[in-house]
Each structure stands twice: as structure tokens, then as C-alpha cells.
Regions:
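Glycine-rich phosphate/pyrophosphate-binding loop regions near the starts of catalytic domains
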Residues: 1-170, 182-188, 193, 261
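Glycine-/charge-enriched secondary-structure boundary and capping motifs
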Residues: 96-103, 107-112, 116-136, 193, ...
Length: 346
């Protein structure tokens, strides 16, 4: 309330709140800086591998802050776990904390506080009690140094190039990007299985630092991380947020299409770059490479003036979905679960 909100939750990967001008010695003459905040927990990953899941929670929170141009500073954790008096519960808590600690050290985001809730159970439909999945929720704050450079997730202009930062789309095996523990497996196949992706903290650091620098230089029009649902869902969210369409050309190969579309992990971020910034963008990538920083980047497509999300591979159409259909499906998700229907959004 009265906190000078710059970006509301949902408009970007993190909420942004302006820091008001202060009085006295050393005070800011005007509001030029802001605090960004985000909360994350890849609950499926934690259930399958608490250590990797704990690392992923911190990495995703930092990535979300970087997507708005904020420098990650610190976290607070909210640890919700079953009984630690059982071998499984004790192991889950210990390994999740180890993962949180490893990622916090690797990304320079200290833990400033938190809380713990143990002995949590849920009642099944048949009346039996079952331990909850381990749920280490990470809240992270970051600093926006210049309010003139805050980036949302929505495409901005037709003709902007769409780039993927982070582990590239490829048919080959990459432990950093997998289908294990994904939304796709759970929603489409009803499976919660596999070992989640390896968390590459060095890649996270380099990609996030590069993105923040590019945003500060005005090279990036939008940025959105690939998390739940992978590439296909991230692209759909950017389309729904903007009303602009997009065309993506997936790399050819013998790999599984569902892996290309829905795999998760890999410190990946989808960004759009205006044509006027193409040369400067490529120079920034070249400079990062020359400096020894690992910042993989692929140009996947272009923002379109039409109201459709399309994807193809080797010129063969794979996906062609109207944005209105995507938005209706998204907005009807809760009513569908509740057995009710809402009128379509105007």
C-alpha cells in the first residue's frame, strides 16, 4: 500500500517497488532505484531430489530478478517439511538445506532469515494421512539500479528477434535440461518421476550477469525465464502478456519434440531484441565470449504482428495456436478444476 509499485506481480518475472526519495545527508535526489522481489519453489524437483530442488529454488529466484534487471542480493527461506524424525524426512530436510546453501554461496545471495514448519501431513481422499512433499520456498530481493531499465515479460514490438540464453536447444543429451520432474510429465502423463536437471551455477551466474548488463544498456525489450513448462509455455506467456504473436523455428534433429518444447532447466531465458539493437547485442555476446564468460545464445525466431503463436522445425509446422485460445485456456484453469465456466475475456 502506497509503496510506489512499478511492476505488478504477473507483469514481469518479479515485482518491482520504487525506493522513495529520502531526506538528509546522502539521500537520493529522486527515485531512481527500486527493490525487486520474487518467491519460488520448484516443488516437484524437491520431491524427487531435495538437494537439486533446493539449489533450483535459489537459482530460479535469482534468474527471475535478473529478468527485470535487478541484481540479486539476499534470500529468506520458508521450509515446509514432514516429520524429521523419520529417515526419509530427515534426509529430505538435510539435503534441501544443503542445496539451498550451495546455491546461495554460488550466487552470492546470503540467507538473512526464515522460518521452519515441520511435521506437516495431508489427508488423502480415503482418510489416510500422508507426509507432504518437501517444500523449501525461497523469497529473494534484488536491487534495480536504474528505474529507466526495468524489463517485463511481454513482447514489445513486432519484428523484434527472439533469443534463447542458457543451455541451447539440442537433440543431444544434456543433464542440465531434461523432462524429469517437469510440468509436462505431471500434467500430460500423470507422472512425477526421474531425477531433475543438474543445476549449473556457473552458467546461471554468467547468463544472469550478461542479461542484467544487456538490460542496463537498453539492448533487451523483454525477458522471461524458462521454468514450469519449458520453452512452449514461456513463449505462450510472453504472447498472452503482450497480445503479439511469435514464430519460433526449432533446431532440426532426431531428438524428441516434447523435449524441445517442454524440457526444463539449463539456466534458460527467453529475450526479445529490437532490430535497432541487433549489432550492439551481437557485440555484447562477442565481448562476453572473449572475456571467457559462458553465455550460450540462440536466435529462435521473431515477434509477429499477428495474434498467433507458431512453431516449426525444418520448415514443417508444429504449433499454430491463436493467443485468444491460449488466454482462455489459461484463465479457465481454476474454474475447470472447480467445475465452473467463466465467460471469455473480452
Amino acid at each position: 500500500v502506497q509503496a510506489n509499485t512499478v511492476v505488478l506481480p504477473g507483469g514481469a518475472d518479479a515485482a518491482v517497488v520504487r525506493l522513495r526519495p529520502q531526506q538528509g545527508a546522502g539521500a537520493m535526489a529522486k527515485a531512481t532505484r527500486a527493490v525487486a522481489a520474487v518467491v519460488d519453489c520448484p516443488n516437484r524437483w524437491v520431491a524427487l531430489d531435495p538437494e537439486r530442488g533446493g539449489m533450483a529454488a535459489v537459482a530460479e529466484a535469482a534468474r527471475n530478478l535478473s529478468c527485470v534487471g535487478a541484481e540479486p542480493l539476499a534470500i529468506t527461506d520458508n521450509l515446509n517439511f514432514p516429520s524429521p524424525e523419520t529417515p526419509t524426512g530427515y534426509w529430505q530436510l538435510a539435503m534441501a538445506c544443503r542445496g539451498l546453501a550451495t546455491a546461495c554461496k554460488g550466487l552470492d545471495t546470503p540467507v538473512t532469515g526464515g522460518n521452519v514448519s515441520l511435521y506437516n501431513e495431508t489427508r488423502l481422499p480415503d482418510g489416510r494421512m500422508q507426509p507432504i512433499h518437501p517444500t523449501p520456498v525461497v523469497g529473494m530481493v534484488g536491487l534495480v539500479h536504474d528505474l529507466a531499465h526495468v524489463t517485463g515479460l511481454a513482447w514489445q514490438e513486432a519484428g523484434d528477434a527472439i533469443w534463447l540464453l542458457g543451455a541451447p536447444l539440442a537433440a543431444g543429451a544434456d543433464e542440465r535440461v531434461t523432462l524429469a520432474g517437469t510440468s509436462y510429465l505431471e500434467c500430460i502423463h500423470g507422472q512425477l518421476t526421474g531425477r531433475p536437471p543438474v543445476i549449473d551455477l556457473a552458467l546461471e551466474r554468467s547468463v544472469q550477469a550478461f542479461l542484467r548488463q544487456a538490460i542496463s544498456q537498453g539492448l533487451v525489450a523483454s525477458a522471461h525465464d524458462l521454468s514450469d513448462g519449458g520453452l512452449a509455455v514461456a513463449a505462450a506467456e510472453c504472447c498472452m502478456a503482450s497480445g503479439l504473436g511469435a514464430h519460433l523455428e526449432l533446431p532440426a534433429g532426431d531428438g524428441r519434440l516434447d523435449h524441445l518444447l517442454f524440457a526444463e532447466g539449463g539456466a534458460r531465458i527467453l529475450v526479445s531484441v529490437p532490430p535497432a539493437q541487433t549489432v550492439a547485442w551481437q557485440q555484447a555476446l562477442d565481448q562476453a565470449s572473449s572475456a571467457g564468460h559462458d553465455v550460450p545464445a540462440q536466435c529462435l525466431g521473431v515477434v509477429a504482428a499477428g495474434a498467433d503463436l507458431s512453431m516449426s522445425q525444418a520448415g514443417i509446422p508444429l504449433v499454430e495456436l491463436p493467443i485468444d485460445q491460449l488466454r482462455t485456456t489459461f484463465e479457465q484453469a481454476i474454474p475447470r478444476r472447480m467445475g465452473a465456466d467463466l465467460p471469455p475475456t473480452a
